[in-house]
Amino acid sequence: MAGLLLAGCGQPAGIDGTLVDDWAPLAEPKPFVPPVGVCHPGGLTKVAPLSSFDPVDCATGHRTETVHVGTFAEGAAGRVAPPGEGSPEIRTAFGECDAKAREYVGNEWRGGRLRLGVALPSPEAWTGGARWFRCDMAELTSVERNGDVVSRTASVRDALKAPSSLSLGCYSVRLAPDRSLREMPGVDCAKAHNSEFVGVWHAPETGFPTKDLDWIRLYAECRKLMATYVGAPNDVNLQFRADVVVLVAKPDEWQGGDRGVRCYLWLYQGTVSRSVKGAGLAALPIPRR
């Protein structure tokens, strides 16, 4: 029995006695990076920890969709914690998300009832090496009056490539007693309306508009879009034919890089029952006082 045990401890032919020297080295563990084109049951968020990653089929009920995933560049990547709200790094990330979102939906996403947000890794994931930022998109019931997030059952990919139910169109602007904007519900362009979405102006890197001079610039740029939309000259008489409604992002979103300004034509008097797009000056008579 002893001889058998000793024989069992010997080295078989061709074995050098070192068990691991011929094994391939283990791959360096890599941080989780979220995929593009997946949908999520939760709403827009600023932090997306791995524990909350629970994607669903975009054909089933969901509230957000990832349209792009980017990587922070060297400067931001060297930080010990994720970039803070409104930081230059977040503005740069939003700019990339903005461009990629337009490609994803097939057009300017602000031309639809859509909202874009940037989600970052958790502080723990950042410490572990995660340097991604996630660009998520949600459909809203309204972009004009801080609408709620809609539960969708289809992807937003190419959703604005052609006019669709998501597209911004015609509205019925209603004023409060003090002449301020009370509401502007969307209506069928074939029915009576006094306002139409005319386009988006991208403001430069400036602070959130607070002074009259700031707003004058925004109104002037929106009038240019209105003139192009209608097919009318952008002259001194245009402001007497129609006004504009200007919609900007919230101050914190503006500081975070969302400088897209939605512009709407607004008729001073009366209504129309067809779109004024391309209709020329005849569609915008100077109202009688």
Q: Where do the model's predicted regions map?
A:
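C-terminal motif of bacterial Sec signal peptides marking the signal peptidase cleavage site
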Residues: L5-G8
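Sec-dependent N-terminal signal peptides
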Residues: M1-A2
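Primary mode marks residue(s) on the alpha4-beta5-alpha5 output face of response regulator receiver
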Residues: G10-R289
